[in-house]
Amino acid sequence: IKQKPPFGLVSTGVDLCWRCHKNQKLVVLQSKYLHKIVKDEGCIACHEPHSSNTTKFLLRKEELTLCVDCHKKETQKLMKQIASARVVHKPVAEGRCAGCHSPHASNYKNHLRAGPKDVPLCFSCHKKMKQQTKDSLYKHGPIKEGMCTACHEPHAGNVPKDLKYKFEKTFYNPFDLEVYSLCFKCHKESVVLNKRTEYLTNFRNGDRNLHFLHVNRQKGRTCLACHEVHMGSQRRHIRKLTPFGTWEIPINFTLTETGGRCSANCHIPKEYDRKNPVKLMIDEEEKKLEVVKKEEK
């Protein structure tokens, strides 16, 4: 004889909950990865059936506490990282694990709400960035490959904007490889260390490395002076406007087959050419290199 459910219930376990929560039933049944606690203990492991003192979803405890109490082993290192971090990602600071992780089931590892690359997940909150990316012709490699976490910590870190490594946001900065540590996780350091090159960069006048000339000095220009970070409307993510204090100054950059030219607002245009070095540039570069030598002393 089939026993009736206790307490006058019409059903038991997840079947009882799914009588109303049909959308969650579909998520669980159609997903590749099922949260272990849902599989082993069902809904009441995390939810009260009648009432709750928490802020939403009749949770037995507040969201962060609920997750950490079960995932103690996995979150031990993470909680230490968060506790010592100078910058905490907003969903983490607010205890919203479910902002990025599906609490019931998911088609992606670690129960992420989107994947396998993290751009769709990040763009679910960062909608302005999503629109800017959509409208841009040239996307930075990590954006193009859908890997925000190549540069950003998803939970917490010690650099503003949740960046993994240091990134200087000023226009001028004394040359130090550490200042560019984020960029040089992908880009070669030699691009700012070699005075001359025929292959490291196309930004050169003959074989004179103009990256070195701009960056490797006491009053060096930072990456941000010329390049957009995420995407841009010009090749190599060259800016149309460069931030300078409270101003934004037009660069007026034009690319040619063998070089380019720019004129920063009030300044006369400057040109460079890889095949036919511009003489005026050579003379000016020599003077600047002398300045660099003096600064080094």
Model-derived features: where do they sit?
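Short sequence/structural segments immediately N-terminal
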Residues: 1-297
